[in-house]
Amino acid sequence: LSMGRDIGHKNTSNKNYFLDEEATTLDCQQSSSNRYSQTNSEYEVGRLTAIDLLDDSQKAALQTNAMTNLVPQSKVMNRYGAWKRTETLVECYRDDINKPLGMDVLSGVLIGSDINNDHFTISHSLMSTPDYMWKLVYFKSENRYDAWIIKNSSNSLGSNLKSYRKP
């Protein structure tokens, strides 16, 4: 996702999650748009692409509610943990008028071998819960990046973000 200055101020409070019709046709997504907390209260809906990154367009922002962009994420990590901190940093980068324009923001999941967190096999047809999430922010004009790999855990606190940074 290529980003420029943050000029959007659309309401991004919508939490109407939905299945992506094309992905459903291809059988490439989870089977339910229900909240993960209904199955396990330690998890909630986590966005790979944050809704506020697209707040210059209501339509684009709401597309982040597609289940193809959502994964079970530790509630702590999502609300005030390390993942939330990366989202805040990206917003700060976009608001910094001294920074040159243009950055790419990429994110994804890493599925490991931890079967103890695979709570959504029946409820959402997810074979595995992501063990880690990653984010990369590439600053085009500076030819540099920030990158993090963060364990999908309630122990992944924002105050520890430096320890998740990758060279």
Regions picked out by a protein language model, each given a short descriptive name:
Residues 1-17:
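An anion-binding catalytic pocket shared by soluble metabolic enzymes
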Residues 16, 23-167:
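Domain-level detector of nuclease and nuclease-like folds
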